[in-house]
Amino acid sequence: MSLNTDDSGRIRTRQRAKRACETCKLRKRKCDGHEPCTYCLRYEYQCTFKPHPRRKPAASKSSARPSEEEDSPKFLDRVDANQEHMEANSGTAFPHLLGMRLNPQGAPKVYGFSWNLGPRDEPLEPFTNLTDLISREEMEDLASHYLKKIHPVYAVLDPDTLRQKIVARWHDPATAASYDPILCGVAALGSLYSGHQEHPKEGALVQSAKEMLETTRISKTTLLHHATAWILRTIYLRSTNCPHASWMASCSTMHIIEAIGAHQDPELVSLVYSDTADVSVNDESQRRLFWVATVLNSWISYEYGRSRVILRGVSCKPPLPRTGDFTTDLISMYQISERLDPDQNNKLSDLEDALSRVERLTLSHDALILSQSNLALTIYRRLRVASSNISNDILTRIIRLGNDGLEAAVRLAEDRSPWWHVANIPFQFLCILLAIDTRESLSYVGPALRSFRAITRHYSTPTLHTALETIESLVRLSQNKKERDLTLLRDSMQQEDPGLTEQGSTTSQAFNDASWLGATGDLTLPDNFDWDWNVFLDTQVPFFDEGEAGGQRYR
């Protein structure tokens, strides 16, 4: 058993405390049982214990809940070591650690006392009041669209809490609240995904949320609300703006997540986050925020070809499944995609295993089917780099998953749900069909183009028209290349040397009689007959006399 010392010199052991203080019970933190406990000392809470109740008979092992099982010692040792190194690096935390040893009751807070010479006066621009932009009825209508379209996939809000916040906000319309950026983000996304003409104040709602969020980045009181609002902004920008804007927003989200300590499990939060950690929310909400933020930042970074934000000391557990949303399915898909990190040196078998895991996912929401398809197309691009010879079975599976995504994209377009992959999957799928360049893959080009044109009719935007023109030009280039190849083959058959006419006639007859052609010499083939070119390319044809240098193999 490993022994560690806490900030006050106590010896910590891997034993569960026999009692917990009221503060740790209320905030669902692991208490070490000391009076005062280490958690309350760090965050300067009042530490009180209730009198010991009469001891009850010990419950059997079979009745213990899974959540009460001891954490893996190796995992805890790794997290502890990481936190100790981070706290040792931190000059802002050291005065607190020193004070804890000298006087635990009067230790200074974790704060950048000598961070610089002091802040300058900064004028505070007033924000646009949310209640001046839209009415309560409009807010409730937009929130209903948000809960119907966005919430099932990215469930970072509690619907009941959201409705209560709306009522409270319009009950006191003159007073701004820290929840306002969330309400602005919900309203903007509700407008975007409503399926109707956008709300006339959608742009103003987006701008208002942006102004408030950019202020909170430099404020001293960063809250979990701000991380939620940054996630909503990232989703909005991923749906409507350029890759750089959504990537920057997703990176800012991750930095806010770190500032509030949401990347660490509440039981293992580090001292270095004590000045900004938000301990006012339940553990499950915190876990959902961290994982959704990580999914968005990682996938946007992969698709954009940029670096993702990697946080140190991550100990946040995945959230539990919940009725009414599919966020845990999204996270499961992300955990498969972690193998595609550019720093991973995957073997061909690793990528094929990842494809099998993607195939086994059973998804019921079209937005998730789009992500599943996108993941399969990404695996294909990695396979092209890993190997020049991809099996036909793998190609068939890639095409099937791509076609599933194409059908989901059409359904979402008909439903007027502008998920970003509605445009991306048809475009990328067509590119990959052309790259595979087999008769099977090319047979899907026509239906895929028709689907892309139908989506463009639903969303007649300049971006989609440009994408459609681009893919049509690539199809024409592929067609022109094949026509040039066909012309070369046709011309080669029409060029004859008069001196070799008689010899050619004899050779032709010999080829008709050759055993490797079997009975196909005089066979009239239908126009759509598909030669197995691999048979020809792998067959040893004696172009030279068998007696001269043993012949050559043509490839």
Swiss-Prot record:
It is found in: Nucleus. One of its GO terms (molecular function) is zinc ion binding. PROSITE patterns: ZN2_CY6_FUNGAL_1, ZN2_CY6_FUNGAL_2. Induction: Expression is positively regulated by the secondary metabolism general regulator laeA. Expression is negatively regulated by the transcription factor kpeA. Expression is also regulated by the kojic acid related proteins kap1 and kap6. Keywords: DNA-binding, Metal-binding, Nucleus, Transcription, Transcription regulation, Zinc. Kojic acid can be used for several biotechnological applications, including use as an antibiotic, as an additive to prevent browning of food materials, and as an antioxidant. Kojic acid is also interesting as an inhibitor of tyrosinase. Finally, kojic acid has also been shown to have strong nematicidal activity. Disruption phenotype: Impairs the transcription of kojA and kojT, and blocks the production of kojic acid. Leads to the declined expression of kap6. SMART domains: Fungal_trans, GAL4. Residues 51-73 are annotated as: Disordered. InterPro entries: Metabolite_Synth_Reg, Transcription_factor_dom_fun, Zn2-C6_fun-type_DNA-bd_sf, Zn2Cys6_DnaBD. Pfam families: Fungal_trans, Zn_clus. Residues 21-47 bind DNA. One of its GO terms (biological process) is DNA-templated transcription. The keyword Metal-binding applies. One of its GO terms (cellular component) is nucleus. Transcription factor that regulates the gene cluster that mediates the biosynthesis of 5-hydroxy-2-hydroxymethyl-1,4-pyrone, also know as kojic acid, a by-product in the fermentation process of malting rice that acts as a chelation agent. Negatively regulates the expression of the kojic acid-related protein kap1. Improves the antioxidant capacity via the accumulation of kojic acid that is also a strong oxidant. This is Transcription factor kojR. It comes from Aspergillus oryzae (strain ATCC 42149 / RIB 40).
